[in-house]
């Protein structure tokens, strides 16, 4: 008898594991017409466990054995040596081999003109040589054992013929769609394998999928929205024109939600209550098209809790899963988070695209749950330029091949069709009269936008707010924001000026936002100086404000925090800083777009931020005028050309984290937690566990560090390490823990010695 796993309640026969994995893979693959293909790779994925070496692994006698390669070897050997191929499509064969081979690690290989040479069986004296791919030895002892394994596979009928009904026909000229399909199939295998293993360990049958109930949830959403309308009516604000416009946006979302599966866009100004309107559209889509779930993708970590909480108020905590890097899950919920198994998922763009464009098994486990779903992107213009084309092509594949609707929500109408490779991209607009909506919004908001003559100084900016008690001022960089904050602080004292940037840990940011909201509500003096972390989803309403020249979408987002409800005349300034501020922009693309905004302000004699022709002129100039902004990086283009899933994932990063340092900081409101962790790490020789990484997320600060700032951090922090085992060697990490309390300021967060070398992304 050969076993797949062992446990305190006994071993699991290999046949049992293969059949349960097959059953689950069929269930997952059915959502995108791939039950047959997913069943095949599930039956073969652990064929290498029917070997003496792997049984020794279970007995604790051997380690560093690769069992996954055996199933791929066998499938490839059968493909080239049988008179009748199990499939006539070589890329389907390459996909199946890659999925089986990488189900515990990663999906690798080219899917166009694939090279299968490394899947040829080794010579008889080479079976025990470590594999080039991972340094492990194959589970097979020799050719004789391979023959035994092959005979077992034939007896069990692990290979079956694949027909056109077992997988969809993916356009051969669309490598982005082909790579996405490969990841989807891989995801089904990984999830089925891990879920089957968990079922054996817990001795429980796998749970049924947690899917959406559209009628019930629409009723709850309408009840929740009506309760908000009653509160607004009781406050005497129901007749405000902005609330009437919000009702129109919501109505349009509801009507268009009753459409077919497709790629849609919602173009509506900032402040028109899109959070609930997006959910109305998604639920109507789920009802019409029988979707299983809704996935809401948000651009910034700072706003995900706010949106998730609003949905929880409407639907209840059990319906909404908040999946981001700061959320701690109890063990009974963690499996649902790993799998995205919930009716409503609220996640960040980093998490979402880590799955959509990655190749690692664990993040990809959840990916197949994108099939038969509605995916909603809030503020889609935040897509990085060097990734935009391939990202949109992958997203276009969702409605075409996976029965998934995609909705882009935006306040700035990005015309992606101006990019050289997206000329034919035309999503369906769900707002009935976009131009009329913006014209109404411009009239009712009653906010004067003034483009100031550059260059400005802190003093000249501050002069614009003399006689004003409340204002928001936003800069491109931490250095500039700090300078303005200290200037106002010197003028007013610290009681009425606040600061937000990436130098603050997440708990500190939330506390600042709570303080600012309270002061605004009580009409107390309040000035907030911030970087762009304020721009999306933070529900603040200042009577006046200012924004340093930035990409047009960023300027519009900041303007959306000024006179949000149109209750009083507002004033909003746009300015450029003097040349003494050497580093005015985070990167070259940000600089180019900021300069386009400044150019258009000069060209148009100001900035009418609700003028669609201005937005159109902006994107036309950005995509036509900037070669980098008009196409993806050359490395990504090459990876797409060959459908090279590994090369693609290596280049596909929403955030460039190669110079990122994570610092655990002594934020005073959570000082007990910090002191406890610091003591633990000292006892552990500063080796941090994954559990400690997760538990400290509220007091972490991520910094993109230059050489000088790294020297500063090393003087004031302890470097952290991780061990390969309890007594293994220490492996360096890009993590630190603060050593001295004064490195974290109660007002401005993690200090920086060389502020000119650091900037916010």
Task: Please provide the spans of the model-predicted regions.
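Accessory nucleic-acid engagement/destabilization modules that flank
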Residues: 2-9, 14-223
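Conserved helicase motor
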Residues: 3-9, 301-302, 321-333, 476-479, ...
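Walker A/P-loop
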Residues: 260-282
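Conserved Walker A/P-loop ATP-binding site and its immediately adjacent core
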Residues: 277, 282-284, 290-314, 415, ...
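Inter-Walker segment of RecA-like/P-loop motor cores
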Residues: 316-357
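SF2 helicase catalytic motif II
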Residues: 350-353, 361-401
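C-terminal helicase lobe and adjacent C-terminal extensions/tails of nucleic-acid helicase motors
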Residues: 399, 459-460, 466-468, 479, ...
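Interdomain hinge/linker at the junction between the two RecA-like core domains of SF2 helicases
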Residues: 412-466
């Amino acid at each position: 008898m050969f076993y797949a796993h062992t446990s305190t309640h006994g071993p699991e026969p290999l046949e049992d594991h293969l059949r349960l994995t097959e059953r689950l893979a069929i269930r997952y693959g059915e959502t995108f017409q791939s039950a047959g293909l997913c069943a095949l790779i599930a039956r073969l994925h652990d064929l290498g466990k029917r070997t003496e070496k792997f049984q020794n692994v279970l007995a604790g006698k051997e380690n560093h054995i690769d069992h996954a390669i055996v199933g791929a070897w066998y499938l490839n050997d059968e493909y080239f040596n049988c008179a009748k191929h199990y499939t006539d499509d070589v890329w389907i064969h390459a996909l199946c081999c890659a999925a089986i081979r990488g189900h515990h690690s990663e999906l690798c290989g080219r899917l166009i003109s694939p090279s299968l040479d490394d899947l040829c069986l080794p010579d008889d004296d080479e079976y025990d040589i470590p594999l080039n791919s991972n340094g492990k030895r194959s589970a097979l002892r020799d050719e004789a054992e391979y023959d035994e394994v092959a005979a077992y596979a034939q007896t069990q009928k692990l290979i079956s013929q694949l027909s056109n009904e077992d997988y969809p026909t993916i356009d051969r000229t669309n490598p982005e769609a082909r790579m996405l399909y490969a990841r989807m199939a891989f995801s089904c295998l990984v999830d089925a394998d891990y879920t089957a293993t968990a079922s054996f360990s817990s001795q429980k049958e796998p749970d049924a999928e947690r899917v959406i109930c559209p009628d019930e949830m629409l009723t709850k959403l309408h009840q929740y929205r009506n309760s908000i309308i009653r509160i607004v009516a009781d406050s005497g604000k129901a007749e405000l024109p902005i609330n009437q416009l919000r009702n129109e946006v919501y109505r349009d979302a509801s009507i268009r939600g009753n459409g077919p599966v497709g790629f849609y866009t919602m173009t509506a100004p900032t402040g028109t209550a899109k959070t609930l309107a997006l959910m109305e559209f998604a639920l109507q889509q789920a009802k019409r098209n029988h979707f299983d779930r809704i996935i809401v993708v948000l651009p910034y970590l700072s706003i995900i809790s706010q949106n998730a909480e609003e949905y929880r108020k409407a639907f209840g905590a059990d319906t909404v899963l908040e999946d981001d890097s700061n959320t701690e899950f109890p063990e009974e919920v963690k499996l649902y988070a790993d799998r995205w198994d919930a009716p409503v998922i609220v996640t960040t763009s980093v998490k979402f695209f880590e799955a959509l464009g990655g190749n690692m098994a664990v993040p990809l486990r959840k990916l197949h749950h994108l099939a038969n779903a509605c995916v909603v992107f809030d503020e889609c213009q935040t897509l990085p330029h060097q990734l935009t084309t391939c990202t949109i092509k992958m997203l276009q594949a969702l409605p075409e091949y996976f029965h998934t609707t995609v909705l882009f929500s935006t306040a700035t109408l990005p015309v992606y069709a101006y990019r050289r490779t997206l000329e034919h991209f035309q999503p369906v607009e769900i707002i009935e009269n976009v131009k009329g909506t913006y014209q109404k919004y411009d009239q009712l908001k009653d906010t004067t936008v003034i483009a100031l003559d550059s260059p400005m100084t802190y003093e000249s900016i501050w002069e614009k707010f003399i006689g004003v008690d409340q204002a928001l001022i936003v800069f491109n960089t931490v250095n500039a924001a700090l300078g303005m904050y200290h200037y106002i602080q010197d003028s007013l004292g610290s009681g009425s000026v606040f600061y937000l940037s990436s130098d603050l840990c997440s708990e500190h940011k939330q506390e600042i936002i709570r303080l600012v909201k309270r002061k605004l509500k009580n009409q107390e003096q309040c000035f907030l100086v911030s970087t762009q972390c304020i721009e999306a989803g933070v529900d603040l309403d200042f009577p006046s404000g200012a924004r340093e020249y930035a990409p047009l979408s960023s300027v519009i987002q900041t303007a959306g925090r000024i006179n949000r409800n149109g209750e009083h005349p507002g004033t909003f300034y746009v300015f450029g800083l003097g040349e003494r501020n050497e580093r005015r922009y985070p990167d070259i693309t940000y600089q180019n777009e900021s300069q386009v905004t400044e150019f258009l302000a000069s060209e148009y004699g100001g900035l009418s931020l609700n003028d669609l022709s201005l937005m159109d002129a902006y994107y036309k100039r950005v995509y036509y005028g900037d070669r980098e902004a008009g196409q993806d990086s050359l490395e990504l283009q090459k990876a797409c050309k060959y459908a090279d899933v590994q090369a693609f994932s290596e280049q596909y990063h929403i955030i460039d984290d190669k110079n990122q340092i994570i610092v655990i900081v002594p934020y005073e409101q959570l000082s007990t937690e910090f002191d406890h962790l610091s003591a633990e790490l000292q006892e552990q020789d500063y080796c941090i566990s994954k559990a400690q990484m997760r538990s400290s997320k509220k007091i972490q600060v991520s910094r993109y560090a230059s050489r000088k700032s790294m020297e500063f951090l090393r003087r004031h922090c302890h470097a952290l390490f991780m061990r390969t085992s309890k007594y293994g060697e220490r492996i360096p990490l890009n993590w630190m823990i603060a050593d001295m309390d004064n490195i974290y300021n109660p007002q401005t967060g993690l200090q920086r010695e060389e502020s000119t070398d650091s900037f916010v992304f």
